[in-house]
């Protein structure tokens, strides 16, 4: 008995479906992961950053604490053009690692008996959504723009739902001149430009009243020059929590800001600025996503307004306020 004609085409149909499988988006694969990392030297909880590098490729940066020491590893990921599968491979502790991504998780083997098993998480900064205290000057809330001016004169892409705006052409300046001490809160969201490198990834900037820039950039597992990464005092000082990338150790630019979250996720800066008496320099302390990145850094004091830089990237801002300390 001959099989029905329809059945004869099933293998071809299956091959066609596999050949045109839709790969997961970069947005769904990139991000923070947590889980376990086990190899010949031992087993421990792992924190992992999967960084989108463009054209379906990724960089996996893993770290764990074993026997009181931080151990790091780095492997590469790629997307199969036919199957759409995202796989990772490389050396971890001298052993070959093979892993694959599926539905928000990455799992695989390390050597003969080791394993990597991690799941994607979302880390929310502790001060995200922090309400302005009594007496604070609200610069951006998505509704009232009396205390902030767009240099172009036009506000663009206002999201009334979350109160965010896209940084306007030419940037934006606060209206009131700040003379002395203050606390400032800024929330920002960097766009994803996976094929870009260094300053091309989600670039903007938060200029304090004295015109010292705290850089805004997609620095999630991404390196750049001194002070040029997210949270850096531009071309002057890196954040105090820089993390090395194993393959770049020994090179000039080999670290990234450990406090940085993935692009497309809301992040927060909280800044304390204090003027000192007797002609001494002002002291600035900053937290990035709840992590202290600058501790009483000395800066030249100058009264002025805040500026938020337009650097050709659709970076978004929301919930910006400043509280002057009398």
Identify the residue ranges that each predicted region occupies.
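Positively charged n-region of N-terminal signal peptides that target proteins for export
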Residues: 1-6
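Carbohydrate-interacting regions of secretory-pathway proteins
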Residues: 22, 28, 32, 43-47, ...
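Bacterial N-terminal signal peptides
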Residues: 7-16
């Amino acid at each position: 008995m001959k099989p029905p004609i329809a059945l004869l085409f099933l293998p071809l149909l299956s091959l066609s479906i596999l050949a045109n499988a839709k790969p997961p988006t970069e947005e769904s694969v990139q991000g923070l992961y947590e889980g376990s990392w086990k190899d010949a030297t031992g087993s421990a909880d792992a924190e992992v950053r999967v960084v989108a590098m463009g054209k379906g490729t990724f960089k996996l940066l893993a770290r764990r604490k074993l026997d009181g020491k931080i151990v790091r590893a780095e492997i590469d990921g790629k997307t199969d053009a036919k199957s759409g599968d995202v796989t990772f491979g490389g050396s971890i502790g001298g052993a070959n690692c093979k892993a694959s991504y599926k539905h928000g998780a990455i799992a695989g083997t390390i050597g003969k008996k080791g394993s990597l098993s991690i799941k994607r998480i979302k880390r929310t900064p502790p001060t995200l959504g922090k309400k302005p205290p009594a007496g604070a000057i609200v610069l951006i809330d998505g509704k009232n723009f009396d205390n902030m001016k767009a240099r172009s004169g036009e506000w663009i892409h206002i999201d009334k739902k979350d109160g965010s705006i896209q940084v306007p052409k030419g940037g934006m300046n606060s209206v009131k001149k700040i003379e002395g001490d203050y606390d400032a809160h800024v929330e920002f969201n960097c766009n994803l430009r996976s094929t870009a490198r260094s300053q091309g990834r989600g670039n903007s900037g938060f200029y304090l009243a004295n015109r010292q820039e705290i850089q805004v950039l997609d620095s999630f597992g991404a390196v750049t020059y001194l002070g040029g990464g997210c949270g850096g005092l531009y071309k002057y000082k890196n954040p105090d929590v820089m993390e090395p990338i194993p393959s770049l150790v020994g090179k000039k630019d080999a670290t990234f800001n450990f406090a940085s979250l993935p692009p497309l996720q809301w992040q927060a800066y909280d800044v304390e600025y204090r003027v000192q008496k007797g002609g001494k320099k002002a002291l600035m302390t900053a937290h990035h996503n709840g992590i202290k990145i600058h501790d009483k850094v000395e800066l030249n004091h100058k009264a002025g307004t805040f500026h938020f830089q337009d650097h050709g990237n659709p970076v978004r801002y929301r919930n910006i306020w400043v509280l002057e300390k009398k």
